């Protein structure tokens, strides 16, 4: 399993822990931190125009939590987030919802905010 590293990750984890320590956060409370992580990582790779839309409009195929844009009105991927600490991403990845999403939305990342799955690629923050 690969590991994320670098400044964007440090800031992201610091924000995650701050939100978690409040004790009353819902899944959506972590969305700004996740969007910022992806934006920062894109910038580190010279992709300064990447835009993240949290909770985009619903489509016929469903509604992943995020859409990732290339800055030129082309969707380059999607992110489906589950609550922080969700340990059964493998089970979730085999659910009807995720099967439908994968068949409809290319480049779908499944995450619990510390583990990220894109197809057979699994990356964790720890």
Place the predicted regions along the sequence by residue.
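A short, conserved, highly charged catalytic patch centered on acidic carboxylates
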Residues: 1-107, 115, 119-125
């Amino acid at each position: 399993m690969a590991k994320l590293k670098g400044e964007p990750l440090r800031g992201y984890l610091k924000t995650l822990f701050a939100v978690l320590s409040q004790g009353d956060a819902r899944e959506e409370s972590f969305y700004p931190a996740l969007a910022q992580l992806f934006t920062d990582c894109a910038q580190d790779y010279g992709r300064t125009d990447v835009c993240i839309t949290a909770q985009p409009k619903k489509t016929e195929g469903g509604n992943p939590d995020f859409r990732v844009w290339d800055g030129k009105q082309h969707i380059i991927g999607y992110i489906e987030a589950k609550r922080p600490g969700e340990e059964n991403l493998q089970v979730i990845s085999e659910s009807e919802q995720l099967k439908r999403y994968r068949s409809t939305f290319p480049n779908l990342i499944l995450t619990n905010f510390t583990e990220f799955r894109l197809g057979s690629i699994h990356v964790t923050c720890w």
